[in-house]
Amino acid sequence: MIKSLSSKVFTAPCTVLALPDLSGVIVDCGTGTDTALSAEFFFERYAGDWNALLNALFAADIRKVSHNVKDLMRTLLENGLNAEGFVFDTALAAYLADATSGKYEIGQLFAGYFHTELVKPVHLEPDAFSLLGDVTAAEAAFHSYTSAVDALYGVLAPKLKELDLWDLYATAELPLCRVLAEMELAGCRVDKGALVSFGEMLSEKANALEQNIYSMAGEEFNINSPKQLGEILFGKLGLPHGKKTKTGWSTNADVLEKLRYEAPIVGAVLEYRQYTKLKSTYAEGLLKAMDPDGRIRTRFQMTVTATGRLSSTEPNLQNIPTRTDLGSEIRRMFIPAEGCVLVDADYSQIELRLLAHISGDEAMQAAFTSGTDIHTATAAQVFHVDPADVTHEMRRRAKAVNFGIVYGISAFSLSQDIGVTVAEAKAYMEAYFATFPGVRKYMDDVVAKAREQGYVETLFHRRRDLPEIKSSNFNMRSFGERVALNMPIQGTAA
């Protein structure tokens, strides 16, 4: 019976009807006579053995099309069932076809491609495709979803081939669904005791700072209120460079960092914010996200970023702080299972290597192939010194220029990042382009091509439409140009 079905492409459940044990799954096996007959016998064969039926349906030799394959795989694996044979994911395909729309729900896609709302019938007559006899409203809606997936498959599969995205989809994106589903289920082990102790330490530090701030202010107030904090710092204490808005004084991090050495209270407030942020977001947030087995299980999102990078939610494990010693303590809370070790692996300067490859700049390629540190090599060229004479500060500035160029940084932004004048930053950039002329040519060419085509793409043909690059608005046009510079590199790296 399975052999008679294996040549068919089925629309697998695009939802589990909110039943984690999968008892609400309906499988629509199509509308053809042969398929319908096969489906009917198929269900009769496994009557009374729900798990056996699901394992047969989700075996590798039954080819299936679905929506949000990763999430369905996770549910199947979580219940000890097969999760094989998925040949197409309509959500993932729609994302590859247009990474900037942000509309990948089944109803949104159906409306977008067929210019009509997805109908949710309230009732259907019992048929050979229902496992449960009478068809409820929820089941009827499910039939509507499977029909929509079927229709979208017919549109999106040829579209990916038309856009030269099929190889990327079939060899990287779709196989990644299974990898991510297994990663989500595995989760990360966390040292709960250490996390609790860390949270208590943060509370003690924050409380001590709070009392110190009150003492320096001469009164108690809500430190977390920008309005009250602004009145204390700029109104009562008269600190300089205050910028008053319609809602009060600005007290964001940039403003306070510039005032850090004007008065001790400013440094105390910045420290207080660091402690309270670490406590609420990480010490407390991670504890709340921890499962009973001591592991945290995030959700990886494949259709969010415009460059193809993954994002992480519930909780976000991609923004664990590392820039401060205190923040780095959070990472130490993630521990391996007994008898295992955690391995931290990263590509070495992948975006700069891609810039060297895509631009074809011989000087930059030579710097990489020689095995020297690229930032030291850049500093030596930009500052006209021997590599052995490059100082830590020279390397730091060269590093900022290297990565800034990839993101289309301006002289003003670079000056802010490395603490020099705009004129100095401009001089660094001019020296950089004189050293790596191929990079300058690449930047000019890719922006011109994006303006002509209306899009940019990666080495794997992942595309991003750029209507902004033709905007009459300077800021919008500048944004489009920066994306044109960065997306081919960042997207290829992703």
Each predicted region: which residue ranges?
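Conserved "right-hand" nucleotidyltransferase catalytic core of DNA-directed polymerases
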Residues: 1-45, 58, 64-67, 109, ...
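Charged catalytic and DNA/RNA-contacting regions of genome-maintenance
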Residues: 12-13, 41, 49-157
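Function-dense linear segments that define catalytic or interfacial modules
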Residues: 29, 104-120, 127, 141, ...
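Short, contiguous acidic/charged loop-to-helix segments that flank catalytic cores in large enzymes
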Residues: 42, 287, 318, 364-366, ...
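Glycine- and acidic
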Residues: 54, 91, 132-138, 160-162, ...
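Short, surface-exposed acidic
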Residues: 83-85, 117-124, 217-224, 240-247, ...
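Catalytic-loop motifs flanking and including active-site residues across diverse enzymes
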Residues: 89, 106, 145-148, 175, ...
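Conserved catalytic core of nucleic-acid polymerases
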Residues: 131, 185, 293, 297-298, ...
